[in-house]
Regions:
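N-terminal auxiliary segments of SAM/dcSAM-dependent transferases
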Residues: 2-106
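Conserved SAM/SAH cofactor-binding pocket of Class I
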Residues: 117, 121-202
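Short, well-ordered coil/turn elements that cap or connect secondary structure elements
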Residues: 63-65, 92, 106, 139, ...
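A short hydrophobic/small-residue beta-strand
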Residues: 31, 165, 235-236
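S-adenosylmethionine
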Residues: 171-275
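A short, charged helix-loop
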Residues: 109-115
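Active-site beta-alpha loop architecture of Rossmann-like, nucleotide-cofactor-dependent enzymes
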Residues: 104, 120, 216
Length: 275
């Protein structure tokens, strides 16, 4: 499978870079590497839609200057690309997310992730905050659903924190395969990885649902998530901006949830809702 690597130069970089990631994510882009000049984004070559990209907000506003170049990369070349920039991430001095080539450190939870083209290493604000939520809440003996699992890192930490029954679901085949690899790499034995979307959810009820996707998918699927949540369960949502929190909360309240708290990092939000 061939991918396009698009190198975006953005001025000023923030918050435009974060906005561009969100917009490109809705166009099928799978992975992003941020840098001082902007970001590098990856999309399957046969899914790239130039017209749709040029119609997104950041290309139509004059608030930012954006230029880009592209080149074709084959799937196996991704390892060399992310290894150049992937540094270990320490969350709350308890959880280290690292690559196989990083040295192990003395932390409570050591997670080894080889992300390849998948989203979810802890570098992005949304993943970092969702990992923080897991560390701040009791997962012992809980059943957990990780929607849009990416690398599987959230489900992996949830199991390490005591969750006993877990499902990790992603619609992208690459993420599905990568999650299987990372689950095995971290010696997790209670995570079932599935390929698909919210339509896979049946009558199974969960104590905790984690969904780090994007605003539009969350708004569409919140009703389904609530139907799969046990009494006194918790729903953690991320992948949206602070200005979207009111809209997300209104949808959760519509289906019987109550807002409890949210974390915020660089205008990104990760919120907790409970029955």
């Amino acid at each position: 499978m061939e991918y396009l690597e698009l190198d975006f130069k953005i001025s000023p970089v923030q918050p435009a870079s974060d906005i561009l990631i969100a917009e490109l994510g809705e166009l099928g882009f799978e992975s992003f590497v941020e840098n001082d000049e902007g970001l590098i984004a990856y999309v399957q070559k046969d899914l790239f839609n130039l017209q749709a990209m040029e119609e997104i907000y950041l290309f139509t506003t004059k608030e930012h200057q954006i230029s880009w170049t592209s080149k074709t990369v084959v799937q196996q070349n991704w390892n060399a690309e992310w290894e150049k920039s992937f540094k270990p991430i320490l969350v709350q001095d308890k959880c280290l997310v690292r690559a196989p080539f990083h040295e192990q450190q003395n932390v409570t939870y050591d997670i080894v992730i080889e992300p390849k083209m998948s989203f979810g290493t802890g570098h992005h604000e949304t993943t970092f905050m969702m990992l923080s939520h897991i560390l701040e809440n009791d997962f012992k003996g809980k059943s957990v659903l990780d929607m849009g699992c990416g690398t599987g890192v959230l489900a992996i930490l949830a199991e390490k924190c005591g969750a006993t029954t877990l499902e990790a679901i992603d619609i992208d085949n690459w993420c599905y395969v990568n999650s299987l690899e990372n689950v095995e790499r971290n010696n997790c034995h209670h995570i079932e990885v599935k390929e698909g979307d919210a339509s896979l959810l049946g009558e199974t009820k969960f104590d905790v649902i984690l969904a780090n996707i994007n605003r539009n998918i969350l708004l569409k699927d919140i009703e389904t998530y609530v139907s799969c949540l046990k009494k006194d369960g918790a729903l953690f949502l991320s992948g949206f901006y602070l200005e979207d929190l009111e809209m997300i909360s209104a949808k959760c309240i519509e289906f019987g949830l109550q807002f409890e708290k949210n974390l915020e990092k660089n205008n990104w939000v990760a919120a907790k809702y409970v029955f």
